[in-house]
Regions:
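Detector for small/aliphatic-rich hydrophobic stretches
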Residues: 1-81, 91, 95-100
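Conserved inter-motif catalytic segment of the P-loop NTP-binding fold
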Residues: 76-129
Length: 130
């Protein structure tokens, strides 16, 4: 393994699922205690990227983030979807308590547009979730 990668993996801000979390950092409960426990007992880390790796999409993975989406919607913040693999089903989200007026779907044309959009969403004070 390269020296720079080794150095990066030692950073406390990088959490790896097979290692216990070293430092408590701000987090949002997932709504599922078992999942919180897998995420170091805290939930989704705030101000961080969380990636869910799945064998296939469309198997109910949105249920993992639905409690967070509900909370963000109650706070009046905007939920951005960047290049979602499928169009979210608005009636189901509305039934689950997510205000669909706060959802913004963005399809970018290339990686440069995607990164520009992501950066601006993350910088915006109206953003609750990307």
């Amino acid at each position: 393994m390269s020296k720079s990668l080794n150095h990066l993996l030692q950073d406390a801000r990088i959490w790896q699922g097979h290692k216990p979390q070293k430092h408590a950092s701000p987090a949002e409960h997932t709504g599922y205690q078992v999942l919180d426990n897998q995420l170091g007992g805290l939930g989704w880390p705030k101000g961080a990227l969380s990636e869910c790796l799945l064998d296939s999409c469309g198997i109910g993975e949105l249920h993992l983030v639905l409690p967070l989406m509900q909370k963000v919607a109650r706070q009046g913040k905007t939920i951005f979807w960047l290049n979602p693999p499928h169009t979210p089903y608005a009636p189901a989200l509305a039934r689950a308590g997510v205000n669909t007026d706060q959802l913004v779907l963005v399809q970018t044309h290339d990686s440069a547009d995607f990164l520009w959009t992501l950066e601006n969403c993350l910088r915006s004070p109206v953003t609750g979730l990307v």
